[in-house]
């Protein structure tokens, strides 16, 4: 299915098997949150700067967001903490490896039981890569752990 001309959230739905646009929005935000947790604030800001495009074309005000709003996080506390903490990399209990990345995606959002975690992550990655420059795509890849990096490359 060619999704190139679909709005961002509809791309996520089409490629992931998520049937509810609100779930697609919420799950995208979770994937973005975990991605941001791996990155420096400066790197996350460079990504956000390229995502100032509508997430969905709709009359529903709850969906009238830019993709950057989802990247930044609509939860003000989470958005603030993302800006003041260092990347969750390296040794320690907060390190985000591939398993923890997928665990968080599955457990921090409304993950439908019929959707595979990897399929959802690849769908969000694919829709996101459609919006980013080659420089941002390459930069994000440098922050991702092994299996998640592979999903990013495949998306």
Predicted regions: what they are:
Residues 1-155:
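General marker for long, soluble alpha-helical cores
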């Amino acid at each position: 299915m060619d999704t190139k001309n679909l709005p961002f959230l509809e791309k996520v739905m089409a490629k992931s098997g998520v049937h509810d646009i609100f779930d697609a929005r919420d799950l995208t935000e979770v994937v973005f949150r975990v991605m941001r947790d791996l990155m420096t604030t400066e790197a996350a800001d460079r990504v956000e700067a390229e995502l100032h495009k509508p997430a969905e074309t709709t009359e529903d005000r709850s969906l009238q967001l830019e993709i950057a709003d989802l990247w930044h996080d609509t939860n003000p506390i989470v958005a603030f903490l993302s800006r003041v903490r260092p990347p969750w990399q390296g040794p320690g209990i907060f390190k985000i490896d591939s398993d923890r990345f997928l665990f968080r995606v599955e457990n921090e959002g409304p993950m439908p039981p019929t959707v595979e975690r990897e399929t959802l992550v690849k769908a969000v990655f694919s829709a996101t890569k459609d919006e980013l420059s080659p420089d941002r795509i390459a930069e994000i890849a440098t922050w991702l752990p092994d299996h998640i990096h592979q999903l990013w490359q495949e998306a």
